[in-house]
Amino acid sequence: MEKEEVLEIFSKLGVINKGHFLLTSGKHSDTYLQCAKIFQYPKYSEIFSKELALKFKGHEIDVVIGPAIGGIILAYEVARQVGAKALFAEREEGVMKLRRGFEIKEGENVLVVEDVVTTGGSVKEVINLVNSLKGNVIGVGSIVDRSDGKVNFEVPFKSVVSLYVETYEKEECPLCKEGIPLVKPGSRKF
């Protein structure tokens, strides 16, 4: 799938939002990517998940896991594409855990997925969880990589599209300095 095609779908679905946003990473940005808009349409969920699954073709994958909330539907749909088990990790008292009877068995090959990667914080938490359970993380996949190539997961990282979007620390944010109201659209509680 070409970048222009992805951007056309994003535009059609209203994925790209402009304003002053507090990202899940804690950074500020003038752009927020609301990938949940993709997942409200099974057709587009399947398209993007299939694209991501193809990037890991040839890998033996037993489990696909994503962090709640952004990775839940993506993990399910990618798992469906590759014939694997789908799980999601969620925070309990600030720590990523498997709940609801989910388990990763020792030695299982695990693909970690997330809708958007900026700093990779949530993904790294899931990787640490999988490693603590003696799973074998074979890679990380996302629909959007907005890290500008700065994230290193120490396993292959592949995305459907890379979009560089400027992010700022709170103290350096020009939008804060202009007095533009801050919006927190993400799912993580601070």
Swiss-Prot record:
The gene is pyrE. Its cofactor is Mg(2+). GO terms for biological process: 'de novo' UMP biosynthetic process; pyrimidine nucleobase biosynthetic process. It is an enzyme of class 2 (transferase). Coiled coil: none annotated. Homodimer. Gene3D superfamilies: 3.40.50.2020. 5-phospho-alpha-D-ribose 1-diphosphate binds at residues 114-122. It catalyses: orotidine 5'-phosphate + diphosphate = orotate + 5-phospho-alpha-D-ribose 1-diphosphate. It comes from the Bacteria. Keywords: Glycosyltransferase, Magnesium, Pyrimidine biosynthesis, Transferase. Its EC number is 2.4.2.10. Orotate binds at residues 118, 146. PROSITE patterns: PUR_PYR_PR_TRANSFER. Pathway: Pyrimidine metabolism; UMP biosynthesis via de novo pathway; UMP from orotate: step 1/2. It holds the Pfam family Pribosyltran. GO terms for molecular function: magnesium ion binding; orotate phosphoribosyltransferase activity. Catalyzes the transfer of a ribosyl phosphate group from 5-phosphoribose 1-diphosphate to orotate, leading to the formation of orotidine monophosphate (OMP). InterPro entries: OPRT (IPR023031), Orotate_PRibTrfase_bac (IPR006273), PRibTrfase_dom (IPR000836), PRTase-like (IPR029057). This is Orotate phosphoribosyltransferase.
